[in-house]
Amino acid sequence: MLYKGDTLYLDWLEDGIAELVFDAPGSVNKLDTATVASLGHALDVLEKQSDLKGLLLRSEKAAFIVGADITEFLSLFLVPEEQLSQWLHFANSVFNRLEDLPVPTISAVNGYALGGGCECVLATDYRLATPDLRIGLPETKLGIMPGFGGSVRLPRLLGADSALEIIAAGKDVGADQALKIGLVDGVVAAEKLRDGALAILRQAMNGDLDWKAKRQPKLEPLKLSKIEAAMSFTIAKGMVAQTAGKHYPAPITAVKTIEAAARLGREEALVLENKSFVPLAHTNEARALVGIFLNDQYVKAKAKKLTKDVETPKHAAVLGAGIMGGGIAYQSAWKGVPVVMKDISDKSLTLGMTEAAKLLNKQLERGKIDGLKLAGVISTIQPTLEYSGFDRVDVVVEAVVENPKVKKAVLAETESKVRPDTVLASNTSTIPISELASVLQRPENFCGMHFFNPVHRMPLVEVIRGEKTSDNTIAKVVAWASKMGKTPIVVNDCPGFFVNRVLFPYFAGFSQLLRDGADFRKVDKVMEKQFGWPMGPAYLLDVVGIDTAHHAQAVMAAGFPQRMQKDYRDAIDALFDANRFGQKNGLGFWRYKDDSKGKPKKEEDAAVDSLLADVSQPKRDFSDEEIIARMMIPMVNEVVRCLEEGIIASPAEADMALVYGLGFPPFHGGAFRWLDTIGSAKYLDMAQQYQHLGPLYEVPAGLRDKARHNEAYYPQVEPARPVGALKTA
């Protein structure tokens, strides 16, 4: 043994070949600060070996290196810029030393090599991979850019276009694509990986492969003519501006950095990467996006713990076909859980099967599946007008019309047709679960399972615990949702549960703005362009359906009369009374016409202004700041109330539900992260300016208390240790 650290070791093989093996405690390898330091110590040893002829890098884990240790990021990002820059310089000196070894080097890459893992293997001369490879640089999704030389080596290895596509989008690619673009040099079966890598290494050692020529382009300026460079970087900047926009500075910073470094050698280019990385790491956007990553890990770990003692449902059923039922059936079947889809109407069953077939055909068109797979999946969806097959299902989700009487009747009837241990769930969006459970003989086997539309795209499933719901029922439904590829978040019962309960105060803020003379177009523009929502409130209402919102608003008002009962006729009422239901009938705040792809495209409709004039004060202008405050305060206050009342268990789960269920702008990190970024005291000052608007603007007592003590909702992270200490960790 030449060297042994906590996360890697170095040993001799034969013929002067050394083997550096990543083998951290736990299930995965991460390129954390300690591992970077340990890699440096291993290189200290290697550089002294006069008989070294070649170096193999490999992993003892199922994945090579899954990336940096994201849990370290928040503390690293709090250190002063100069200190962070010094540590990056140290880390890059380690990878440069690996790249500059006077012998050929190869990485045997299995499974994941992401972020720092990818940057590590880029420093070796050759890369041999297994078919399960996922390799790439996802840093821009975390609000930063590659910091261990990825923005320097990848363009010089692949060419500007392929590298820009991976780095700017934060992409990873599979084995076939990596081989095609030159990111790896070969793909072999897992059992042949080590021997295959050693064979390539010996070819390089024997002179059959020119490893020095392979290494040289990574040390030199990017080989691009002025015209090629202008085209590549202009196109990349245009694409980034279109997709990322101003709220996500990392992708455009990465592109500009690669462009500026294109005519520089490795050392000078790394200096530019360092200078670009450090300011990004100190942005609110980076903290928010890293926070989302950590919250996502927390939510998934919680679901895994919750389901460890239950068996994932093997057969499921959906009550109610149509678009929603068909979407749920597709998602279950697509992920390997056969499903019975029942309705009382042939027409609805046809609609549900058509929806499932349409989604599968899209997968076929994209090359994700072949015709055989399509036929196999669709055959696991059994449409029926009867209860045939219900005796073998483990879980049933009801997705019929949002009417408590209808839902109760359907659920009670279904309960009599299934096994005593079968779990029933309702896809209701607002009706309290305990109310629906009142007609059931086994309420402990019943819970809410709120999917979001479109089911195949929206990651969130709210799992709602009623008064009598058992832990086993919750665990089974969470297991099914996880199997379907969704992110389940468990919430307690109340009207609207969590997501809709906090959405309708936001809509109420919008209605009050329109009542006071705001133009809905301006409000939408501000909330989209300035705050960052994917849709403004008017557009969102049109997509949800004005009739759906009108009904849900009444349910929420009955549930929370003190805050959500309004004493005036609003824009939603006016449009509803005029039969303008949004996209579903082509008329809402906008008029809709299908484009060439069959997607509804919004157009101005002057008739709306005269309709809204009856429920509004004369038009007046509002500042962007006032629009954002009046829209967001009601939502944030309600989010805080949900935490205080135990409807949602933690700030992390609340923020993930908002991001995954409503499209809350990820660069804000969710309501609690946004609150912490603003500061509770500053938020209280802002909210108090609008408390005259009514109870929705009254800040909850717990938040007032936080403001008094200047406390945050997330645990406060301490800055990382000084860079000198990090070096020798």
From Swiss-Prot:
Organism this protein belongs to: Klebsiella pneumoniae subsp. pneumoniae (strain ATCC 700721 / MGH 78578)
GO cellular component assignments: fatty acid beta-oxidation multienzyme complex
Family listed: In the N-terminal section; belongs to the enoyl-CoA hydratase/isomerase family. In the C-terminal section; belongs to the 3-hydroxyacyl-CoA dehydrogenase family.
Protein name, as recorded: Fatty acid oxidation complex subunit alpha
Cross-referenced PROSITE patterns: 3HCDH, ENOYL_COA_HYDRATASE
Disulfides per UniProt: none
CDD domains noted in UniProt: crotonase-like
Catalytic activity from the UniProt record: a (3S)-3-hydroxyacyl-CoA + NAD(+) = a 3-oxoacyl-CoA + NADH + H(+); a (3S)-3-hydroxyacyl-CoA = a (2E)-enoyl-CoA + H2O; a 4-saturated-(3S)-3-hydroxyacyl-CoA = a (3E)-enoyl-CoA + H2O; (3S)-3-hydroxybutanoyl-CoA = (3R)-3-hydroxybutanoyl-CoA
Active-site feature positions: H450
